[in-house]
From Swiss-Prot:
Primary enzyme class: hydrolase
The organism's taxonomic lineage, starting at the top: Eukaryota, Viridiplantae, Streptophyta, Embryophyta, Tracheophyta
Protein name: Chitinase 5
Entry superkingdom: Eukaryota
Keywords noted in UniProt: Carbohydrate metabolism, Chitin degradation, Chitin-binding, Disulfide bond, Glycosidase, Hydrolase, Plant defense, Polysaccharide degradation, Signal
């Protein structure tokens, strides 16, 4: 028939459709803008679960292991995708043990926290120290371990001192309700606390944080994963504002604005020391 499309016309139509879809995909990826607890998938859409946080995840609490689309949001897991430094090359055995060896003998954490457990956890959060410049990446690693050092006493403590006697249950939080007999005191490298942190952290990592919070003090990889989960959701995005912004994100209500200058100074000194070890300037806005 005279009005039937020819093979050549069909080919041009198919090519045009492919280009349109490609452009749409790129535009949505560039403007993902997900909430902090959601992942930006390799196709540029927000959500949770392996379809969004797995292979090719661009930003957010990515599972890692991907190697898909790099760029501004985080790139692939492990050694592929994204910019920044290799975390493994910065966090050497000498650096990690240099912190831990300052803890007194007999500390529970000395036989719990290991460099390998940290690296295993870091592979699940591909945006950590991987989506910015080399110097920015080193500063982020220095900041993370400065807070870990302060929170755990050079990796001495796994559990918060006298934590079991504290009440970290927000009964008004209906999404992550406290479970009978369970305590949500500080555990792990960043001493994650409160039911509203244990619940979503466990959901993201793959354990029941509300019913089994002690898991954070029993499995060193899960322990580091909870720290990195908290970091990526609460601290990573303010890192470029300076180390002081990270203090405010972690414990600002109790330390900033002159409330505990000794704690602030300790965190800053650890950070400056680790930046020196990494050969990078610590930048400005160090205090809060």
């Amino acid at each position: 028939m005279a009005n039937s499309p020819t093979p050549t016309m069909l080919a041009f139509l198919a090519l045009g459709l492919a280009l349109l879809l490609s452009a749409t995909g790129q535009a949505s990826a560039q403007n993902c803008g997900c909430q902090s607890n959601m992942c930006c998938s390799k196709w540029g859409y927000c959500g949770t679960g392996k379809d969004y946080c797995g292979d090719g995840c661009r930003s957010g609490p990515c599972y890692g292991g991907g190697g898909g689309g790099g760029g501004g949001g985080g790139g692939g897991g492990g050694g592929g995708g994204g910019s920044g430094v290799s975390v493994e090359s910065v966090v050497t055995e000498a650096f990690f043990n240099g912190i831990k060896n300052q803890a007194p003998n007999g500390c529970a954490g000395k036989n719990f926290y290991t460099r390998q457990s940290f690296l295993n956890a870091a592979h699940s959060y591909s945006g950590f120290a991987r989506d910015r410049t080399n110097d920015d990446s080193k500063r982020e690693i220095a900041a993370f371990f400065a807070h870990v050092t302060h929170e755990t006493g050079h990796m001495c403590y796994i559990n918060e001192i006298n934590g079991a006697s504290m009440d970290y249950c927000d009964k008004n939080n209906k999404q992550w309700p406290c479970q009978p007999g369970k305590k949500y005191y500080g555990r792990g490298p960043l001493q994650i606390s409160w039911n509203y942190n244990y619940g979503p952290a466990g959901q993201n990592i793959g354990f029941d944080g509300l019913r089994d919070p002690d898991r954070v003090a029993q499995d060193p990889t899960i322990s580091f994963k909870t720290a990195l989960w908290f970091w990526m959701n609460n601290v990573h995005q303010v890192m470029l504002q300076g180390f002081g912004a990270t203090i405010r994100a972690i414990n600002g209500a109790l330390e900033c604005n002159g409330k505990n200058p000794g704690a602030v100074n300790a965190r800053v000194n650890y950070y400056k020391d680790y930046c020196r070890q990494f050969g990078v300037d610590p930048g400005g806005n160090l205090y809060c």
